[in-house]
From Swiss-Prot:
<dbReference type="InterPro" id="IPR036291">
    <property type="entry name" value="NAD(P)-bd_dom_sf"/>
</dbReference>
<keyword id="KW-0560">Oxidoreductase</keyword>
<dbReference type="GO" id="GO:0051287">
    <property type="term" value="F:NAD binding"/>
</dbReference>
<feature type="active site" description="Proton donor/acceptor">
    <location>
        <position position="155"/>
    </location>
</feature>
<feature type="binding site">
    <location>
        <begin position="98"/>
        <end position="100"/>
    </location>
    <ligand>
        <name>NAD(+)</name>
    </ligand>
</feature>
<feature type="binding site">
    <location>
        <begin position="165"/>
        <end position="166"/>
    </location>
    <ligand>
        <name>(S)-2,3,4,5-tetrahydrodipicolinate</name>
    </ligand>
</feature>
<feature type="binding site">
    <location>
        <begin position="122"/>
        <end position="125"/>
    </location>
    <ligand>
        <name>NAD(+)</name>
    </ligand>
</feature>
<dbReference type="InterPro" id="IPR022664">
    <property type="entry name" value="DapB_N_CS"/>
</dbReference>
<keyword id="KW-0028">Amino-acid biosynthesis</keyword>
<keyword id="KW-0457">Lysine biosynthesis</keyword>
<dbReference type="GO" id="GO:0019877">
    <property type="term" value="P:diaminopimelate biosynthetic process"/>
</dbReference>
<dbReference type="Pfam" id="PF01113">
    <property type="entry name" value="DapB_N"/>
</dbReference>
<dbReference type="InterPro" id="IPR023940">
    <property type="entry name" value="DHDPR_bac"/>
</dbReference>
<feature type="binding site">
    <location>
        <position position="36"/>
    </location>
    <ligand>
        <name>NADP(+)</name>
    </ligand>
</feature>
<keyword id="KW-0963">Cytoplasm</keyword>
<dbReference type="GO" id="GO:0005829">
    <property type="term" value="C:cytosol"/>
</dbReference>
<dbReference type="GO" id="GO:0016726">
    <property type="term" value="F:oxidoreductase activity, acting on CH or CH2 groups, NAD or NADP as acceptor"/>
</dbReference>
Length: 268
């Protein structure tokens, strides 16, 4: 049986990829997508919006118009996502969240919602990136206490948050594995005379340029050698296909707060 999916914020770069991925997925039935009431794409065909030709499904301006969906996929903004979370919880709908930049308090709100609804919070829905998280856990356990750890990320000029949600998640995975508090050991950029490096810190470096889809590298550096774990995305369709996989998995999930590690069966 196909899963009925609605795309929230479907007129953006990611939203258009999600439309195409959902329309072409054998196990997904695309039932609609939302845009803001002020959007120039109100009552617009989703297929035309995504550049794949008309598919006979028009954009909506409210979630209530998409109530036939089983699972909603949200790559909008922090404020909009939290509003959509409330609606989905009240209407017993599952939600895949790809929006990034949430504060710790906002993540707690999403986690709390997971007590009464099924929700996935995934700063990156790429299968490769989530395998990388697992590799980081293994690497940190083996050599994390003996190396200097730095995280580098690069994205397109239009990305609004920095460092990326994926980079923060990388740091969180490493810090948790090593028993460190990321809020205390994270260093976001360096300038001037910084002195010798504190061995327990985890550094973050950010690039915003051109049309870079997404690049992430974790460095585990010692004197004489270093290990680099890198993921590079060349197409947003990678994230869209991962989101479809998450939506299909979520349809049978009990109420809970999940991530892509659950979807891929990578949890210990």
């Amino acid at each position: 049986m196909k899963v009925k999916v609605a795309i929230l914020g479907c007129s953006g770069r990611m939203g258009r990829n999600l439309i195409q991925a959902a329309h072409e997925h054998a196990s997904i039935e695309l039932v609609g997508g939302s845009v803001r009431t002020s959007s120039s794409f109100v009552d617009f065909d989703l297929g035309e919006l995504a550049g794949i030709g008309a598919i006979g499904i028009k954009t909506s301006t409210t979630l209530a118009q998409l109530a036939t969906a089983d699972v909603f996929i949200d790559f909008t903004s922090i404020e909009t996502t939290l509003e959509n979370l409330t609606w989905c919880n009240e209407n017993k709908k599952a939600l895949v969240i790809g929006t990034t930049g949430f504060s710790d308090e906002q993540v707690q709100v999403i986690e709390q919602a997971g007590k009464t609804m099924s929700v996935i919070l995934a700063p990156n829905t790429s299968v490769g990136v989530n395998l990388m998280f697992k590799l980081l856990q293994v690497t940190a356990k083996a050599i994390g206490d003996y190396t200097d750890i730095e995280i580098f990320e690069a994205h397109h000029r239009f990305k609004k948050d920095a460092p990326s949600g994926t980079a923060v998640k990388m740091g969180q995975v490493i810090a948790d594995t090593l028993g460190r508090d990321l809020n205390k050991v994270a260093v976001y950029g360096r300038e001037g005379i910084t002195g010798e490096r504190d061995r327990e810190t985890i550094g973050f470096a950010t690039v915003r340029a051109g049309d870079i889809v997404g690049e992430h590298t974790a460095f585990f550096a010692d004197l004489g050698e270093r290990l680099e774990i890198t993921h590079k995305a060349s197409s947003r369709m990678t994230f869209a296909l991962g989101a479809m996989r998450a939506a299909f998995w979520l349809k049978d999930a009990d109420a809970g707060f999940y991530d892509m590690q659950d979807v891929l069966g990578l949890k210990d």
